[in-house]
């Protein structure tokens, strides 16, 4: 019977091609809008390292001056730490791994076939960064902990930077000039650009990963001025690197890998003891607010999913609902126009259930075709967004890629909604008395 109902549906399509195309087009537009919006929203709202959510913690202290009378501070401690606080906490042996970091700009030169210097955004960090955040390598690997102490002149390149400087070949072991100092390449990253950039959201929640990585201690050796966010208070106004490391300024990020509750409690106590010591010395005059942020709470703190994104998602589903309502109206009109044929089938012995199933199969075919076209449209729209924002750091260009799980959910939801919306027209045509249309024949 199913094959018979499919043949009847195809005949119906040929009888009313314009109306059928209109219904399919409405469904396709609604589904494509939902898929594109839900894909971007799902990427924004996702935790890019969910499997380590209860292991990785952002470390914050509040070393700022007391707030002015009457002022309120609902945001909690700043994301970053001062040089003294960050280096002290980094020296703890409690975490399994730890990562201290800043971002800055530097120049790479000396690569074969490149006469001039290439300006890069690099990250001065520690060896733990790569293993903590599961950073993949195409060639080589990270430097070891001993290289952090020296520091040794070692560097890790991103895949894109290695492609640019060495044509994508294995450059491990080669030398390159970093700010006119010879550095040895120890590793080249594979494709890695998690969104949101959970490990560093001091400036923005979405963006491109760093192009090169060097041991954090080179920051002090070369007096590298940070390019990331910096916040100072009091009379702090540093103009040189020695002034910066002693100033009341926060500009360094610190993460700790704490695998169990015992290590978390131990490190929290370590932070609290440090706070008490500094408080006695005249620092940390605000109420104690030492925090360890798991990744999911860190993302929530930074409002990664904005109210505008939520509103856009609601509008996309509202648009789909409007498309479906219009489709129901058009479909009901189409079925009622074919009521004389339905009356003949009823007179020949077809039951109301058979009529209902016949029109439900037709609705399902329309939903299937509309969903397929909507999927193709959404693919084209996501490609267009990527092309539009190619080369920019805009979040939409980075997030507009096909996420199979998000697309599957959106497609299944839209197709199911279309099928449910078609229940009423199919039921309504089955309730039409056949005698009325037989008399008109």
List where the protein language model places each region.
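Membrane-helix entry/capping segments
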Residues: 1-6, 11, 15, 19, ...
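Intracellular coupling helices
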Residues: 6-18, 325-361, 365-366, 431-440
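Short, strongly hydrophobic transmembrane alpha-helices
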Residues: 15-50
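Membrane-proximal extracellular/periplasmic loop immediately following the first transmembrane helix
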Residues: 37-110, 116, 248-253
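Short acidic/polar micro-motifs at solvent-exposed secondary-structure junctions
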Residues: 62-79, 99-128, 142-155, 177, ...
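Mid-to-C-terminal secondary-structure elements
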Residues: 128-142, 153-302
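Transmembrane alpha-helical interface segments in multi-pass membrane proteins
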Residues: 325, 341-386, 409, 413-417, ...
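C-terminal membrane-exit region of the final transmembrane helix in multipass inner-membrane proteins
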Residues: 406-441
């Amino acid at each position: 019977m199913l094959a018979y109902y499919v043949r009847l549906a195809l005949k119906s399509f040929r009888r009313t091609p314009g109306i059928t195309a209109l219904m399919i087009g409405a469904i396709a537009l609604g589904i494509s809008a939902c898929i594109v919006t839900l894909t971007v929203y799902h990427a924004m709202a996702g935790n890019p390292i969910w499997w380590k959510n209860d292991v990785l913690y952002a470390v914050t202290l509040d070393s700022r001056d007391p707030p002015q009378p009457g002022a309120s501070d609902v945001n909690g401690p700043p994301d970053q730490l001062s040089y003294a606080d960050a280096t002290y906490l980094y020296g703890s042996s409690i975490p399994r791994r730890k990562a201290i970091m800043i971002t800055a700009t530097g120049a790479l030169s000396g690569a074969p076939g490149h006469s001039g210097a290439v300006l890069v955004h690099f990250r001065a960090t520690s060896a733990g960064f790569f293993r903590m955040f599961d950073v993949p390598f195409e060639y080589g690997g990270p430097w070891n902990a001993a290289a952090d102490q020296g520091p040794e002149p070692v560097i890790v390149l991103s895949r894109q930077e290695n492609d640019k400087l060495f044509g994508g070949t294995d450059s491990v072991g080669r030398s390159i000039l970093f700010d006119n100092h010879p550095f040895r390449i120890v590793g080249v990253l594979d494709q890695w650009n998690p969104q949101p950039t959970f490990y560093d959201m001091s400036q923005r929640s979405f963006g491109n990963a760093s192009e090169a990585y060097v041991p954090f201690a080179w920051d002090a050796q070369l007096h590298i001025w940070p390019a990331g966010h910096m916040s100072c208070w009091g009379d702090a106004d540093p103009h040189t690197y020695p002034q910066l490391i002693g100033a009341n300024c926060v500009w360094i990020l610190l993460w700790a890998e704490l695998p169990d509750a015992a290590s978390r409690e131990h490190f929290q106590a370590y932070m609290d003891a440090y706070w008490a010591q500094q408080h006695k010395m005249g620092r940390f005059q605000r109420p104690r607010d030492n925090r360890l942020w798991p990744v999911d709470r860190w993302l929530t703190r930074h409002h990664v999913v904005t109210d505008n994104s939520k509103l856009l998602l609601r509008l996309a589903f509202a648009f789909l609902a409007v498309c479906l309502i219009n489709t129901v109206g058009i479909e009901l009109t189409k079925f009622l126009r074919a009521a004389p044929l339905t009356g003949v089938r009823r007179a020949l012995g077809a039951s109301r259930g058979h009529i209902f199933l016949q029109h439900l199969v037709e609705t399902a075919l329309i939903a299937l075709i509309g969903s397929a076209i909507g999927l193709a449209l959404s693919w084209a729209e996501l490609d267009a967004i990527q092309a539009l924002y190619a080369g920019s750091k805009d979040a939409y260009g980075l997030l507009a890629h096909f996420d199979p799980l998000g697309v599957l959910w959106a497609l299944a939801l839209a197709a199911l909604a279309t099928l449910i919306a078609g229940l009423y027209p199919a039921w309504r045509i089955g309730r039409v008395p056949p005698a009325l249309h037989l008399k008109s024949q």
